[in-house]
Amino acid sequence: MKRLGLLPWLAAGLAALPGAAQAHLVNSGLGPFYDGALHLLLSPGDLLGLLALALLAGLRGTTAARAAVTALPTALLLAGLIGLTLPVIPNLAWLSTLAFMLLGVLVAFDVRLPPVIIAALAGVYGTLLGLLNGSTLATMDAGVGSLLGIVLTAFMLVLLASAAVVPLHAFWARITVRVAGSWVVAVGMLMLGWLAQGAV
């Protein structure tokens, strides 16, 4: 009977033992490619920007979606390779947050931009993500394998999300996409508040 009384204490003691902390890059144990993919999937700011870009491109049609799907991974890969060689870039979380908020505003207001401008926005956002992620990977001694995981995951997310939006022509469906854009902006405002308080 007394042994059962010790079991909860033993379990609590084992649960309290700290494990290794990972500051930024997720170590999945599956290799650098999947570490990079998980890094992107677990970075809410990066995910929201990619989602907003995909929604914007999808609202503008097939040509704009194809332009974004081409420009984003190209810029992300090239800027990431440059970022791997740079010294540590200062924390620019506020710039990344403002960038995805801008994309969310464009979605929420259903701004009609030509495919060339969509491609340019995708290229600029991809460059920003590439420099920031490449520099982060360099500080973690992660290399091109992790960068490729990030690039291919971003490519697939934008490809699938924009492809889901392109065929939506019903008024209510387009409003739903625009509401999602407004939520991206709302989350960005929350993140800016956290950044201002130093919580992120």
Which positions does each model-derived feature cover?
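Membrane metalloprotein/metal-transporter helix-bundle signature
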Residues: 2-200
